């Protein structure tokens, strides 16, 4: 896969460095056999241009297809997951009727099985779970967002006034797969707020309360 080498070499040149610690494939390429991609990735590792390999937006079968041909281990899978995006928690169709997880993908189960670290982008649902944005009336997920925010706010007092943002991140951090939320902001205070989520020890009962609120249905 020539584009893989072109991509990493371009990144190295732009940053003025000799290697990257982690190189992640942004998404699967349906027009390239995974054996071809794996061969190029292994060359990059052997040449010292890349230390570790990860993937992004890969479903379990896609990860297995790449892993079959790859000598280097896959150490990360960067995925969209939050209380508003629950699919990675489920295997197959384990979600409830009418819930946002009615067709789960089981990524987190695979991460546990294969010792892959899940990296969560959009951990507060594109900002909606901060509670600082007004949800438009025509937003397709308005009811779900508001129900989840209500549950987060009701839980605040039990965790020393934790914000919805902090509790939403703490919910991810509590999962046994070892999720690492990817957060960012131009505001240092927002960074401090999100970092403080790591100090919250969410109880099992409260974790499930948030899950039920986010699903919009009881857990079977």
Please name every model-derived segment.
Residues 12-33:
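Active-site groove signature of glycoside hydrolases
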Residues 30-220:
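Beta/alpha (TIM)-barrel catalytic core signal, keyed to glycine-rich beta->alpha loops juxtaposed to Asp/Glu
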Residues 1-15, 61-64:
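Short, acidic/polar
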């Amino acid at each position: 896969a020539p584009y893989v080498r072109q991509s990493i070499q371009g990144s190295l040149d732009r940053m003025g460095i000799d290697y990257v610690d982690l190189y992640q494939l942004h998404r699967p390429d349906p027009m390239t056999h995974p054996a071809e991609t794996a061969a190029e990735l292994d060359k990059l590792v052997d040449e010292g241009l890349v230390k570790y390999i990860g993937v992004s937006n890969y479903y379990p079968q896609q990860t297995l297809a790449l892993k079959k041909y790859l000598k280097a281990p896959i150490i990360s899978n960067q995925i969209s997951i939050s209380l508003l995006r629950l699919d990675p928690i489920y295997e197959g169709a384990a979600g409830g009727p009418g819930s946002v997880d009615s067709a789960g993908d089981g990524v987190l189960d695979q991460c546990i099985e294969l010792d892959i670290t899940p990296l969560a982008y959009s951990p507060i649902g594109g900002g909606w779970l901060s509670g600082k944005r007004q949800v438009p009336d025509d937003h397709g997920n308005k009811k779900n967002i508001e129900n989840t925010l209500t549950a987060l706010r009701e839980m605040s007092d039990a965790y020393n006034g934790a914000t919805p943002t902090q509790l939403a991140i703490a919910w991810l951090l509590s999962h046994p797969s070892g999720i690492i939320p990817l957060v960012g902001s131009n505001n240092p205070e927002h960074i401090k707020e999100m970092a403080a989520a790591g100090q919250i020890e969410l109880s099992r009962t409260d974790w499930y309360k948030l899950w039920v609120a986010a699903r919009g249905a009881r857990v079977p």
